[in-house]
Amino acid sequence: MDINRRDFIKLVGLGSAVFVLGTEFSSEAAEKEFYFVQLSDTHWGFNDAKFNPDSTGTLKKAIAAVNKLEIQPDFVVITGDITHTNDDPKERRKWLGEARDIINGLKVKDVKILPGEHDAALDNGEAYKEYFGKTYFTFDHKGVHFIVIDNVSDPTSSIGDAQFQWLSDELGKLEKDARIVVFMHRPLFDLYPDWDWWTRNGTKAMDLLMPYKNVTVFYGHIHQENHHNTGHIAHHSAKSLIYQLPAPGSLPQRVRLPWNPAKPYEGLGFRSVQAKIKKAEYLIREFPVMKG
């Protein structure tokens, strides 16, 4: 689906729905529910003006835009690729530290961060954990159980056995109608494996999630919006904050799309997600980099 062609999209699974809106998050809704902001694929350290001449400024602009939101979110989640790949362990840590310092500029101090393969695949997440902590974890917020999955630290694009056992144990604590939101970097389903847009053993994770009626997944990695349902499980990818990538399979190869001087920051942005807990619905609004 192309959300740019419609002001309103409703994706309905058997137990969850997502509305993609072009309206503001209301103060009335804020009193009843909650919302969070999702940033993704900031790639701090990337430096190629052909694809983004403002590579050191785009993340800062996004942080400023979030800080200008009239109603501040309950928390912010950053779904991976905080930094760009760097083979030098010392330089990699420098970039992780710089990115952390910029992220600390958010007014909202409850920030959930998870790795992307650019952050973690070269050393199984060791440097990442020095700066941001655990690569997978859970938390609860106002009636929603959030699960953060690490499908990037293993360089084979897989989820490890220990994490599967952990996931099974965590899900075993929940009722089948629990409100569950899952964050990860890669798509859990086979979006386009030829471009590494998948999780090699993602089907196993979905088999664990499938018995639960209300599951929604938010991820990054593909640098664009994509909305997909696996049965009743809805999957929603976020835009990048550094450069665009083509639609899945639209070009012979996965290549970065050049910066458009006539439309600076085109295709880049972040989103807010309003949780309507009783109905297990999530209202999404997309923001450009320059606006809050």
Regions found by a protein language model. Give the residues of each.
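N-terminal export signals
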Residues: M1, D7-S27
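N-terminal active-site segment of His-dependent metallophosphoesterases
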Residues: L11, E24-R93, L191
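Short, motif-level signal for alpha-helix interfacial/capping segments enriched in acidic residues
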Residues: V18, G22, G57-K60, W197-Y212
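Active-site neighborhood of phospho(di)ester-bond hydrolases with catalytic His/Asp-centered motifs
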Residues: L39-S40, V76-G80, V111-E117, V182-M184, ...
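Solvent-exposed loop/turn segments at secondary-structure junctions
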Residues: T42-G45, I82-T85, E117-A121, V152-P155, ...
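Extended active-site neighborhood of metal-dependent phosphoesterases/phosphodiesterases
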Residues: D88-R179, T199-T216, H228-K239, Y243-L283
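Short acidic, glycine-rich surface-loop motifs adjacent to enzyme active sites
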Residues: E175-L191
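C-terminal/domain-terminus segments
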Residues: I284-G292
